[in-house]
């Protein structure tokens, strides 16, 4: 898990655009963050299973 200091650091505006990085707003994870929802794949999956993301349902084909 990310430290609270890293979460606070990420909220500040980066001086250069290349220094900016995405971080999950719920758990602080850096990898596999969905930009549209601003959460990581793990949190996204949990919220989708709980039905907290409108219009999202498990794919079946």
Swiss-Prot record:
<feature type="binding site">
    <location>
        <position position="40"/>
    </location>
    <ligand>
        <name>Zn(2+)</name>
    </ligand>
</feature>
<dbReference type="InterPro" id="IPR023053">
    <property type="entry name" value="Ribosomal_uS14_bact"/>
</dbReference>
<dbReference type="GO" id="GO:0006412">
    <property type="term" value="P:translation"/>
</dbReference>
<keyword id="KW-0862">Zinc</keyword>
<feature type="binding site">
    <location>
        <position position="24"/>
    </location>
    <ligand>
        <name>Zn(2+)</name>
    </ligand>
</feature>
<dbReference type="GO" id="GO:0005737">
    <property type="term" value="C:cytoplasm"/>
</dbReference>
<feature type="binding site">
    <location>
        <position position="43"/>
    </location>
    <ligand>
        <name>Zn(2+)</name>
    </ligand>
</feature>
<dbReference type="GO" id="GO:0015935">
    <property type="term" value="C:small ribosomal subunit"/>
</dbReference>
<keyword id="KW-0479">Metal-binding</keyword>
<keyword id="KW-0699">rRNA-binding</keyword>
<dbReference type="InterPro" id="IPR001209">
    <property type="entry name" value="Ribosomal_uS14"/>
</dbReference>
<feature type="binding site">
    <location>
        <position position="27"/>
    </location>
    <ligand>
        <name>Zn(2+)</name>
    </ligand>
</feature>
<dbReference type="Pfam" id="PF00253">
    <property type="entry name" value="Ribosomal_S14"/>
</dbReference>
<comment type="function">
    <text>Binds 16S rRNA, required for the assembly of 30S particles and may also be responsible for determining the conformation of the 16S rRNA at the A site.</text>
</comment>
<keyword id="KW-0689">Ribosomal protein</keyword>
<comment type="subunit">
    <text>Part of the 30S ribosomal subunit. Contacts proteins S3 and S10.</text>
</comment>
<dbReference type="GO" id="GO:0019843">
    <property type="term" value="F:rRNA binding"/>
</dbReference>
<keyword id="KW-0694">RNA-binding</keyword>
<comment type="similarity">
    <text>Belongs to the universal ribosomal protein uS14 family. Zinc-binding uS14 subfamily.</text>
</comment>
<dbReference type="InterPro" id="IPR043140">
    <property type="entry name" value="Ribosomal_uS14_sf"/>
</dbReference>
<keyword id="KW-0687">Ribonucleoprotein</keyword>
<dbReference type="GO" id="GO:0008270">
    <property type="term" value="F:zinc ion binding"/>
</dbReference>
<protein>
    <recommendedName>
        <fullName>Small ribosomal subunit protein uS14</fullName>
    </recommendedName>
</protein>
<dbReference type="GO" id="GO:0003735">
    <property type="term" value="F:structural constituent of ribosome"/>
</dbReference>
């Amino acid at each position: 898990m990310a430290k609270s200091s890293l979460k606070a650091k990420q909220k500040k505006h980066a001086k250069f655009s290349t220094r900016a990085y995405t971080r999950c707003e719920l758990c602080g994870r850096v990898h596999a963050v969905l930009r549209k929802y601003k959460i990581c794949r793990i949190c996204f999956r949990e919220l989708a299973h709980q039905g907290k993301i409108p219009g999202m349902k498990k794919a079946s084909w």
